[in-house]
Structure formats: C-alpha cells, structure tokens
Amino acid sequence: MFTMDSLVFLAIAVAILFAAVQRGGDGARTMSEKTHRAICGAAIAAGVLVRLVRLTSLPAGISAEEALVGVQAKALWQTGGFLFGQGLTTQLSQWAGETTGPLLAMLTAPFVGLFGMSKLTVRLPLALLSCAAMPAAYGLGEALSGRRAARWKLLIAALCPIFVLEARMTCGSCAALYLLPIALCLIAHGVTKPAALYPGMIVLALTAYAQDMYFFIAPAAILACAIIALIFGRRKRHAAISGAIGLLLYVPAMLTAFVNLTGAEGMTLLGLIRIPRLEGFEKTFMAENWSVGDKLWAVLIGGVFQVLRHENIHQAMYTPDGMLALFMFSLPLMALGALALFARWTDGRRAAREKAAARAMVAATGAVTLAALVMFGSVGTLNTNGTTGLFDHSALILFDAVLMTAGLCTIERKNLRCAAAMVALMAVNFAWLAVQLFGGSYQANANVYFSGFEQMAARAAEIQAETGEKINVTGNIYPHIQPSDGAEMMFLYATDADMRTVEAERGTRYETIYVSDDMQPEADQIYLARADEISNWDLEGFDYEESEGYALIYPAR
C-alpha cells in the first residue's frame, strides 16, 4: 500500500510531531492580525486557483457522473423534470449508488439553462460550492476553538488534495462534502446569531439529496443540532423552528429510504415529488455475520484511509501519479489531534458556552455519521483496506480534517518552529499536487474520462444532422454500475441533445447497444464503438474515423 515517497513524507511529519511534543513553550504567542490575514488570504487564493483554472480542459473528456449531472440539469431546465419519467425525484435512477443524488443537477440547471450546456457550465457549480466551503471551514474552526483553529482548518480545506480533486469531479455525491461544513458553520454560529440556524438546517437537510448516505445521517444530525441549540442558544424558539424546517425538507428523503429498505412500492408525494423504488439500493443491514465492533472498526479504518486512498488511487483512476505521498502527513496529525482532544475532554476545564455548543454539534454529527455507516453503509464500506465504498466514506472526511486541525493547533501551541516546518511540508505537498494536476500526470491518469468518445459522439451528431441516420452507441465504455445507462448519458452530453425530444427519439434516432465481434453493421446506420470491439467487422461500404481508441463508422458517401 505504501510507496517509498509516501513513507518519506510520513517520516518527516512524524519527526516534526515528536520535535514539537518534546520541545515546547514558545507557541503560546499569538500571531499578528496582519500575518494571520496574509496566510488566510494566500490559502484562499491558492485554493480558488486550483479549483477553477483550466476547468474545461482538466480532466479532458467526460465521465458518466459528469454527463448525468449535465444532462439532467438541462432536462430540468427545459422540461421541469428529470429524464425518462422521473419528474422531480429524490434519487436519479439511471444507476443505483451514492453518486445519483439530484441536488447538484438542480444547482447546475440555471447555469446550463442560461448559458448553454458546456464543460464550464456543468463543472462550475460544484467548483464554486467548494470555494464557498473554504470560508465556511474557517468559520467552523473559529466556532470550535478560535482563530488558530480557523486558520488551520482553512488551510486544510483549501489545499488538501481530497477537497481539490473532488471539486473538479462534477459528481453528484461530492456536493455533500462541501455542504456539510457550510451547514455546521452556520448552525454553530446560530447559537449566538439565531438567524443563522435557518439556512444551516436547510443546508444540512439538502445533503440528503446529494448523497444517499445522508438519508440516514441528516435527520439525526438535524435533531441533535437542534437539541444542542435549544440547550445552549439564546433564543430557543429559533432552534425549534429551524430544526422543524430542516426535518420537513428531509421528509421526501426519509420516504425514499423507507421504500427501498422495506420493499414498499414507490410513490408520488403530493403529486409532485417522485419517491422511487430503486433496483439496486445498496444500503442494508449488511454483513450480519459481523459483530458491531467489527463493523465499527471497518468503518473507522475505511474513514481514515479515505484520506490516503480516496479517488481510487490504488487503481490509478482520477488521480495523479504518486498522490499517495500527498496524503501521508495526515496520519500523525490525526493521531495527535485525537490525543489532544481526549486530553482536553478529561482535564475538567470548561469551554465558553458558544464553543461548547459548536464542539457538541460536531461531535454529535460525527457520532451519527459513524452509527449510520455501521448500520446502513454500502457493502464496500466493510472492505477494511478503504478502497471501496468511497462516497459513503466521504461522510467522514470532515471529521478527519477536524482531527488534523486539532493536531496542527497542538503543534503550534508547543513550538512555533515545528508549526512552520509543518506548513512547509504542506506547501511542498500542495506544490506537488499543482504540478501534477496541471503538468499532465492528472491528464494521463484520469482514465475514466473519455475524450475520444466525446469527439466521436460530436462527429456522429454532425453526420446525423446531414443524413438522418440512426446512431448506435456502444454500452461497453467502462465497468460502470449500469454501463449502458452511463454510455447513454455520455452520448447525450457530448451531443448537447434537446431534452424535450430525447425520450421520443430513444431507440429511433439513437440507441445504446452491446457490441460483439461477430456483429455486422446495418448499411444505413452509424456506429460508435471502441476500436477493438469492431476489429473483426466487415466495414466494406463504410467510412471509418478514430480518436483515442474510439471508432466511428458510417455509410460511405
């Protein structure tokens, strides 16, 4: 699992940690306001830069998840509902899984509707949401412990590779990663500013429509935060009302979980919102032969190693070469942070009322998340090497970051030089990330983005506009949960289809098929497939074009 370069980073981080613990005293000095602002401003600028620069070209091509967001966003804008009879729904049913929440498509719809469907309009909303999560991370750190924690929390949110890479993925479930710190920041500040409770509870409820793991996390988190706000807040009625609003918004998600866990029939709520019965809903009381302790350990290990192996690093998908090393310094920081928080909890000192409330809210949400993952997480969550159940595990990333923040604050309090050394290590990590992200490694390794398919699909649409011939699209693009559905979404995205006519044209103007070696093409139709799929075909009478492993054949003119 560990490479030599990753072990070098781990060793440096551990050495800094031990030096800070054994030598201490000067960290009690506070940083000047000017320096603090300069560091925070630089972190935000760097974070925004790597999220937004070359957004339309890196990664090249399109993925099934990105296509799903773009196509359904355009469908929502043009028709008022999602494609293929889904209407307004709580879970897009193109394929089952954590990546098909409708929220990101809803956020993307105005961009696509007003400015047209392009990579910029489809990718920009999630990137902007991730930018908004950076000041929210600062606010959450400030609510938890003060300015020092706010600064470190901001640095992690802005520069940590996980937060950067997910901001560029345009996957529906990634929205939850950025909604959660925004929600907790608002709710934590709502203890002293009750008006902030309302948007905070609303955002927390919306996580259930980003990633289906929050079907189970969101209601308990809303209830816990509302109770804590009732106990610590100044105007208790605001806590009760805002909590009720959050739970009300959550009702459609609750019904979706009920339908799919009990086997009940799908329904339409108030004649408006479709509550779907999904064929492969993955959340179950799974691995029943495991003890609760074994499940908890598996979830914890998976959550920690998310920081190391997120984005399928082991399979070299999505992620630049050598990225494992960029995560390694997090391990000792999380360990030190956990010990520091435990020591503070047992020393008997009382925190200020506002900070005590914020800490209780984060702790309660973390506990709810762990419990939900143990009870309902995907089967992959129980794979202890942390390489599967990725999007389920992403629910824990915020709490990994909180532990890292606590560790960094401890180092700064102990020794300023060691804190500076850790900043330097983080800077090296981030510089390496930026070099690989924009220098070509990310481009070469993002092998679930298919630029060749995109180019050939657009070319097929040009030919069809001239001839009216039917386009047959291969469903064998990559091993997706539902390969043909993924291919269909990618084709509709690449051709910028009119969503008002797509359902009527399905099977007539275009069709997704499974290609075989012995298949012979119809003389009056267009075929888009992998080049190796049609190597044995008789192509007499057809013109042939190819791009990056994808072939287009069409009747010769």
Q: Language-model features: where?
A:
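Luminal/periplasmic acceptor-recognition loop/helix of membrane-associated glycosyltransferases
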Residues: D5-F9, A461, A465-R557
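Flexible, glycine-rich phosphate/dinucleotide-binding loops
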Residues: F82, L165, D294, H480, ...
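A generic local structural motif
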Residues: A143-L144, A351, A457-A458, E511-D517
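Transmembrane helical bundles and short interhelical boundary loops of multi-pass, membrane-embedded
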Residues: M1-V8, V251-M254, P276-F281, E288, ...
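Membrane-integral, polyisoprenol-dependent glycosyltransferases
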Residues: M1-L272, A298-I411
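Membrane-proximal, lumen/periplasm-facing interface regions of secretory-pathway glyco-
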Residues: L58, L92, N383-T387, C418-Q464, ...
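Ser/Thr- (and often Asn-) enriched beta-sheet segments in non-cytosolic proteins
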Residues: A240-A244, R359, F399, R417-V423, ...
